[in-house]
Amino acid sequence: MSCNEKNRGVDDRETEQPVFRNSVEAQRIPAIQNGSITAQQLTIDDNLLVDPKLLFIGSKIGEGAHGKVYEGRYRNQIVAIKVLHRGSTPEERAALENRFAREVNMMSRVKHENLVKFIGACKEPLMVIVTELLPGMSLRKYLMNNRKQQLDPRMAINFALDVARAMDCLHANGIIHRDLKPDNLLLTANQRSVKLADFGLAREESVTEMMTAETGTYRWMAPELYSTVTLRQGEKKHYNNKVDVYSFGIVLWELLTNRMPFEGMSNLQAAYAAAFKQERPSIPGDIPPDLAFIVQSCWVEDPNMRPSFSQIIRMLNAYLFTLPTPSPSSPSSPKSDTTETATTSNGAITEFSARARGKFGFLRQLFAAKRAKNSQ
């Protein structure tokens, strides 16, 4: 199953050519993680493989914990080529090959205009994923380059809608991204929209709902991913796709404030503050109450109280409709029609405008029910 798709090609370029072998092993090999066999090795269909003779690798444009990303060329397209680490032991190799196959299979299955387009993969002698190359920068770099001022509200909401639509597509296909953050959101050439990238930590929702807490970057991670004792990597935890909604709430806060979440804290300090002290980034008083409510509904502690991405899309569209038509004389930040706002840092929901109460009544009833239950 796929979502709405909008594809676009790019042009041509050259550099050095790696030697690839176009083959995929058909057998299933046990994948070993944390010293025990957890799953069978996944395989990649031949129709997902690109012709290695047409693939050229150029200069490095990025690097992460699991691999490096290069600019390259495939046929007549400039592409992004992600080369993943193999591992140094048989156990690491099996686990990383399984992760690679999972990422390829998920990326090839979902198509949406706000998801980076998957082109193909190679397995030998390097594990490679080929995607479209977006000429724009990451949302993280874009925000840092404009750190002295907040984004135009309409632009911030449009970016948020792009992300929410991409995530709604993933969730509709039973995929949890688990690493939603500005580094994995890439701007298009005109810097008017963003696309979601990097499925390296994504997982399909399973019947057992047992997944490892190795995921994501702590500053954006949902509290339920943490252990009640420690933050041991690889520990099994019960969670669902609402972990992505929490991360989206942090990203939306960044778009509205253009600040780093949990400023002044290390990643582990931020994780501890969110998980054990129920702290959240403070919401400035100039953030309209309607938007403050959306942010806080996303990062509320109880995952079941968080909205779905389809609900988030409706709320953001409803707010976007209230903004004045852009004009050269319009102020960059629209004024709210209310004086009450939410500025608490612990995720609690405070009073908002009559307009917000009517617009988001279905969610407010959920929060009221939760507060009543907790007070008993």
Where are these regions (language model features)?
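Short beta-strand micro-motifs within the conserved protein kinase catalytic domain, predominantly
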Residues: 117-125
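Regulatory alphaC helix of protein kinase catalytic domains
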Residues: 100, 104-105
